[in-house]
């Protein structure tokens, strides 16, 4: 099972958890969770006017062995309006490249942050991948 929690944070309410959303999916091949502005395609949806987040920004996908990965999907622009950082609990944050994929270790937990390049807004997605 993969469990996600998401909070949309602006500079004025840093640290607030109001508006937190949660989603989960079983660790079955082909299971998918998405994060983005498109409420029809994404289980976790950001505010509509946060244009630094793509319609479908992050895709969590379960592979054939029941392991999960996250991909920052490429959008229509060559130069994205955001940066994405990935960190496991206890580890240093590292950049997730535009179009890049990171594996989520079984039993692992951490956070993925989508940061607006032009302002203080961010989308913080916490994850826990049950072993």
Feature roles, as predicted:
Residues 1-51, 61, 65, 101-131:
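Intrinsically disordered, low-complexity acidic Ser/Thr-rich regulatory segments
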Residues 57-59, 63-115:
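Forkhead-associated
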Residues 54:
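Beta-rich catalytic cores
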């Amino acid at each position: 099972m993969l469990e996600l929690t998401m909070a949309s944070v602006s500079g004025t309410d840093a640290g607030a958890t109001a508006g937190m959303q949660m989603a989960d999916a079983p660790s079955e091949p082909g299971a998918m969770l998405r994060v983005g502005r498109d409420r029809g395609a994404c289980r976790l949806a950001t505010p509509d006017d946060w244009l630094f987040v793509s319609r479908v920004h992050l895709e969590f996908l379960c592979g054939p062995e029941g392991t999960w990965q996250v991909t920052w999907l490429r959008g229509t622009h060559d130069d994205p309006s955001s940066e994405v950082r990935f960190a496991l609990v206890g580890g240093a944050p590292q950049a997730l490249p535009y179009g890049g994929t990171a594996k989520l270790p079984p039993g692992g937990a951490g956070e993925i942050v989508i940061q607006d390049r032009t302002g203080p807004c961010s989308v913080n997605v916490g994850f826990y991948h049950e072993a």
